[in-house]
Amino acid sequence: MEVELGRRAAQQGTSDVVKQFGQKMADDHSKANAELMTIASSKGITLPTDVDAKHRAMIGRLARMSGAAFDKAYAKDMLSDHNKDVSAFQKEADSGADPDVKAFAAKTLPILKEHQSLANDMNNTLNGGSKKSGGNSNKAGNSNSNQP
């Protein structure tokens, strides 16, 4: 989901921060997704390729937007999504049952925290700081609820 939305933001975003964040999301999440696919494949697990209904709705809603409205909604959605991702990956890194998945979560968590911080900064800039992530500020970001 973050890859698809990141590509859309990089092309459709009107502000530089949205375009840069979107490109970072597409790049970082593509790498993480490929690594996760390799882990899953080595264990004989097939990961879902379809986006869940909630995220399909988010993609559809954003696809119908343009201009500043798109930028603001994308920023808000990415902050919310990355807040959830960081929580899920932290839980997996701390107490996951599978050592390979646990290691993947621990390795990916700092990247997601960077994305969370960047999403927070982007949201603050575009939406007047309505939400806080608790992360540190950096540059551009990346996310995908079931996958990084």
Residue ranges: model-predicted function:
Residues 1-148:
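His/Met- and acidic-residue-enriched segments that coordinate or traffic transition-metal cofactors
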